């Protein structure tokens, strides 16, 4: 029955499926400023009004000056403001209190991140793994893509260790998506391959 199957899945002596850690790719909309507070907002805030204002300012400035430079400057200023939420200080720290939604446990604890996704995206991959491994052997790893990959590698290592501890297996499989491959290479470089059964890029 289902209970017996779940118990079997947790028993490494009878379970042949290594837990899977899915290292997602870069997520432009996945970073939040002041997450969990009343001031929470996405680090990337597009506003059509700001875009139209920039175009008006740039075009009118170029016409008035009979020079294209005012238009280019308006575009540069607009881009700087649009991407300001991603800004980092010279010391490598974030300019703002930026964080990403994290899912430290297995996918069985977060059905909302995969149950209704049927695609080739990371969440679709998570669903495929959760339904076939099952969910208690599936981990979706998210990260702040602005950070040094070797710093992100430490968090990947923690996720790998958690997957091993919770599943009872001695190794994991790592599936990478896009920029997640860079982060995974940093993990393998820093921590080695001893806890990895296979890695799919």
Question: At which residue positions do the language-model features occur?
Answer:
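N-terminal non-catalytic accessory region
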Residues: 1-175, 179-201
């Amino acid at each position: 029955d289902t209970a017996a199957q779940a118990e079997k899945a947790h028993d490494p002596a009878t379970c042949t499926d290594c837990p899977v850690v899915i290292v997602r790719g870069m997520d432009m909309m996945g970073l939040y400023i002041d997450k969990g507070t009343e001031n929470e907002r996405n680090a990337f805030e597009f506003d059509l009004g700001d875009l139209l204002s920039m175009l008006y300012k740039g075009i009118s400035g170029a016409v008035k000056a009979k020079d294209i430079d005012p238009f280019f400057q308006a575009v540069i200023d607009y881009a700087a403001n649009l991407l300001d939420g991603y800004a980092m200080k010279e010391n490598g720290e974030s300019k703002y209190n930026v964080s990403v939604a994290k899912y430290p446990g297995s996918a069985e604890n977060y059905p909302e991140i995969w149950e209704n996704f049927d695609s080739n995206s990371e969440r679709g991959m998570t669903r495929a793994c959760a339904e076939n491994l099952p969910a208690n052997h599936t981990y979706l790893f998210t990260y702040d893509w602005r950070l040094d990959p070797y710093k992100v590698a430490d968090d990947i290592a923690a996720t790998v260790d958690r997957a091993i501890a919770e599943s009872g297996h001695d190794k994991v499989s790592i599936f990478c998506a896009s920029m997640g491959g860079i982060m995974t290479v940093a993990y393998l470089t820093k921590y080695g391959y001893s806890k990895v059964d296979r890695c799919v890029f």
